[in-house]
Amino acid sequence: MRPRRRELAACALWAMLFLNVTAGILFISNAVPIMRELTGAAPATALAIYGFIAVFNGLGRFFWGAVSDRIGRNWAYLLIYGTQVVIFFVVGGIHSLPLVTILFAIVLLDYGGGFGTMPSFTADYFGTKYMGVNYGWILTAWGVAGIVGPIFVAVVKDRTGSFAGALPVMAIVLLAAMILPIVTYRPGEREGPFYKGLLRRARVGA
């Protein structure tokens, strides 16, 4: 196995986790004020609702972990990114408290799903022998995102005047990031699961 391919794959996984965590931290750290901006909910109401839906962060680790076992890690991460892109683009125009609550719960599910999927992603790509070291390195993306995320929010809020204004910007970032799970594949393989799927469909249609 070529070392360069291993390094590129490791960097791709690191970037995938970093971007998902950055989006999650942006959202989680400002969920209550964003909910209040969008719906006009009272502070106590928004805080109580967020406290209730916070459980989806934990559930996402199990849900997306199970989904990735069935459809593959790349597809799972593509869906995690994709659902957030759609929500971050549209939620700014929604002012119904129940609907905003549902969308927020899905974002929390996606945030937890990034963590639930990445350990298996790492093991699939690099094996389990050095799992602690490999995943430990990739997990540094969490720490870096914890620094970058709040700075990103502060800059965008200064420019837009609201916390909710940061969501479409993050949606654009995640939309671009959707290329990562498409082009990333195991170091020992010649092509990724998306390319293999296209080849299979082409052969069936031929």
PLM regions with names:
Residues 83-95:
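C-terminal ends and interior cores of transmembrane alpha-helices
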Residues 70-81:
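Cytoplasmic membrane-interface "Motif A"-like loop-to-helix N-cap segments
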Residues 113-126:
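Intracellular juxtamembrane helix-capping segments at the cytosolic ends
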Residues 155-172:
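A membrane-interface helix-boundary motif in multi-pass transporters
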Residues 5-66, 119, 149, 153:
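Extracytoplasmic gate region of multi-pass secondary transporters
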Residues 171-206:
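Multi-pass alpha-helical transporter architecture, strongest
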Residues 125-160:
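A late C-terminal transmembrane helix in Major Facilitator Superfamily
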Residues 18, 99-113:
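Hydrophobic core of transmembrane alpha-helices in multi-pass small-molecule transporters
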